[in-house]
Amino acid sequence: MNKKSVLVIHGGAGVISKSTISKEREEIFLNSLKNILLAGKIILKQGGTSLDVVQEAVRLLEEDPIYNAGKGSVFTELGTNEMDAAIMDGTNLKAGAVGGVSIIRNPIIAARAVMEHTNHCLLVGKGAEEFAKSKNLEIVEPSFFFTQNRYDQLLRAKDEKKLILDHDGENLLEKEKEKEKNNETSTTTTTISVGVDPIDPKYKMGTVGAVCLDSFGNLAAATSTGGMTNKMHGRVGDTPIIGAGVYANKNVAVSSTGTGEAFMRTVAAFDIAAMMEYGSLSLKDASNKVVMEKLITVGDGGVICVDKYGNVEMPFNTEGMYRGYVIIDNNCENDQNDIINVSIYK
């Protein structure tokens, strides 16, 4: 048995600071993260595998509408929800992903089904949805994913002919509404112009993810997202791209959040693993080099990582990232040596 088991989760990165998020909303996120970590801890304590744990952690994140994934997914320019998800097993490099799905309740479950029941890594759109139906996964009406807050973001983006990238748009919009309530004039920019390059590095991100080391020493990673508010119909980001939004092997597991196109261009998740394997860098050095030196030149965001020794790194180059981890001492029968931590800001 491995000396320790570890679960790390994130709920997205972006313009998340104490000046853009209310204390009440801060507590909602922290409690949600903690509860999901506790649920994952139970599975690990019962001898669950890393693959089962990351799937369940991400499924729970998808079920909570405060995150931009599953139930809380943002809307496209057409007023629809198009979700992406991916999962990877570090023990054998098997992976599965879905992209642009609109009626699958939990895209992460569909991603695992792709991994386990097809010879492919990625299915998209209607094909992915038909496959999910064939595997008796839960299918819902598109209206299931409607949330007023996300729809308000879309209306605002359309009204200003802009693109809002969660969590920035959500938190800054919340702050602006608060100012309007107090009859103040807000000068905070909540959106970015759609132009040749709509991915402004100052504004990002909405994704959820999990990485895990189980008691058997196995690693796994999973990521899920609704994308960005007012995105083009058919746009797919880094989340379902193996090596960009998610990666796991026998040394490390990584889940990304941030400027999707930047993570694809830098193959960020795989780059961390490659630096560790071929450059003999530590998890800390590799993850920080990618996020703080390489990624930042083309976009913003962060990653959560755990290596085969149970070391945890969660670097991000934005103002904040919803994140947390639980570390379980497998040599101790009770919980006295277990560690759980949740945080938002730097």
UniProtKB/Swiss-Prot annotation:
GO function terms (MF aspect): asparaginase activity; beta-aspartyl-peptidase activity
Modification comment: Cleaved into an alpha and beta chain by autocatalysis; this activates the enzyme. The N-terminal residue of the beta subunit is responsible for the nucleophile hydrolase activity.
Gene Ontology biological process: proteolysis
Residues the entry annotates as binding substrate: 235-238, 257-260
Active site: 207
CDD domains, A to Z: Asparaginase_2 (cd04701)
Catalytic activity: Cleavage of a beta-linked Asp residue from the N-terminus of a polypeptide; L-asparagine + H2O = L-aspartate + NH4(+)
SUPFAM superfamilies listed in its UniProt record: N-terminal nucleophile aminohydrolases (Ntn hydrolases) (SSF56235)
Enzyme Commission number(s) of this protein: 3.4.19.5, 3.5.1.1
InterPro entries, per the entry: Ntn_hydrolases_N, Peptidase_T2
Residues carrying the site annotation Cleavage: 206-207
Keyword entries, A-Z: Autocatalytic cleavage, Hydrolase, Protease
One Pfam match: Asparaginase_2
UniProt keyword Protease present: yes
Function: Has both L-asparaginase and beta-aspartyl peptidase activity. Does not have aspartylglucosaminidase activity and is inactive toward GlcNAc-L-Asn. Likewise, has no activity toward glutamine.
Family classification: Belongs to the Ntn-hydrolases family.
Subunit structure and binding partners: Heterodimer of an alpha and beta chain produced by autocleavage.
Protein name, per record: Putative isoaspartyl peptidase/L-asparaginase
